[in-house]
Amino acid sequence: MRLPFEKQWLVPDHPPFEPDCFVIPSYALKDHSTPTKPTIAEIELAADWWRRFPHASLIMCTGDNQRLGITNASVMAAYAVRLGVPSANVIEEDQSLNTYENLYYAQKIIQERNFRQPTLVTLDLYTRRAVATARKMGWTDFYWLSAYSRGEPAYGYKWIQTHSRFTLYLYEVLAMVYSKLVGWV
């Protein structure tokens, strides 16, 4: 269920017409082998689009930012493969620890592999910040898709961030303020 004040925060999707890569920043992991519902929603949306464009690659972003001893990217990649995406189409960006780094390292992969139509796939509450960060970094000719999800407690310090739809919203508003203060957006 959407919160009454979400409408002002959400940005409309900008769907691609011929995507060659989907960039999926992790929202969080529940444990060593399970993404949280928001991250699952992102992966499932990307996999749905991959089925329409099977030549495309999925770039799973985020290192071990929860100190689980495994990268979020590897857990996300395994989930995508279970959904039927061939491992040859899944790229693990496992160095990043935050949104800025997700997009920085993803941009390097996009340039190295000569992808032409990158598409961000994010939680709907996260899209505004991810798109603003990408624009500030100089991304051009990119697209975005948003996945809806309820919250679910994540492992460790991300527990409160992902606990509920309300805490996801609150976190994103505060993260946008922080991103403005540090110059990421």
Predicted features and spans:
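A structural signal for short, hydrophobic/glycine-enriched beta-strand patches
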Residues: R2-H163
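A transmembrane-helix-recognition feature enriched in membrane-embedded lipid enzymes
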Residues: Q161-V185
